[in-house]
Amino acid sequence: MTFRSFVLGLSTALFIAGYNHFSDYVVKQGRFISNLMPVAVYGTLLVFLLVINPLLRRLWTKWALTGRELAVIVGFALVACSVPSYGIVECIPTGIMLPKHLQRLEPGWKKIDATAMAPERMLVDVSEDEESYVTDYAKGLAEGDEHISPRQIPWRIWLRPLGFWLPLVLCMAIGTLGLALVFHRQWSRHEQLPYPITRFTRALLPKEGRALGGVFHTRAFWIGFLLIFLVLMNNYMCRWWKDVLIPVRLYLDFRPLNTLVPTLVEGHGLRLLRPTLLFTVIGLAYFLASEVSFSMAFGPFIFCFIAGVLAKYGVVLRTGHHQSVKLESFLFAGGYTGIVLMVFYTGRQYYWSVLKRCFGLRSGDTIAPAAAWGMRVFLVATAGFIAQLIVVGLDWQLAVLYTALCLIIFITVSRTIAETGAFYIGTEVFPGAIIWGFLGATALGPSTMVIMFMVS
């Protein structure tokens, strides 16, 4: 990591965090960060490699960024993508202020004093002037097209909740990064997982002394690139000249055949009969084993068919909202747990050796210092996460169970990305809902459930 790569990476992260809201809600050109492989990052990287980096190399060789430096910058950018959009910015501020607003509007909330069930540290402190603070947040302080000054924001009411939420998020983020150092060697060296997105990125990055990656010198790449570019550009221009150009359909519509597969439709599989051609997915499939691609393609059909069969017997898997107690969530939770158990069993010798080296004990295997330090960071950060849940009122047993479920989700999603390159992953597993379903509302109590669901 060079100094300029650190500065450029940090600047890129700050730009993403600041520009995302403007792009999504002012320009309204679609989600700036739409999935786990954002076009905002990889598209910019492609343009930089094709245009800017060769130009920098022509001006002065040392100005061109190396592959290692670009990897650092991309890493910063990807981490920053977790902050705006669906991440921290859209969830936490609204989640800790909106309950105050809803209590004023909903008679049921007011009758039971719903916000009193949440610990004070988890919500904003509006005791000074609740009417003004809550109304200003709900309606906004800006008038017309005029923007407000940062000084007009009542920062003091946000200090208490942010003092809880930011350390909580940082503990989980730092802990999972440490865990990634532990898993990486086992997954990449011992199990030889394909890492499709990483391999794709590495193919783009230039080697030492070059401005372009090796893939840009391949004729097959340019043929495929130009064909896809022409198709997408034609479809874009069709939005402006609809009467002149003919769009190329990027989907196959088999929905008229739905009467032939009523069981699939009953299992909410109708949209599977209208598959969309995603060129990114097609490209990443070349990095995978054929059986993995086959499983990814036909797995949803099998799941929806089974769901349709169960629905005919009155067993509905998909019902309620995403954090409700439903059978589908428990199916996924069981599957996630099974995957994590398989991961630990497969690398049990390595993980046990890392754990021993973490505490300074000897092990028969050669363990990289980074893995041992990663385990130490993970254990400390996880302990910090559990401690903060206990401080706000969660029993230590539930805090440990909740944290374990969170880690199961992160490990499973990470394993899926490393093994398949899937970048559209919408998990249906929420720790609060799973614990609620297992123990019941009576055993947990309202305050405990509020804490778990707010953290979810």
Pin down the residues of each PLM region:
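Transmembrane-helix bundle segments that line or gate the permeation/cavity pathway
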Residues: 3-456
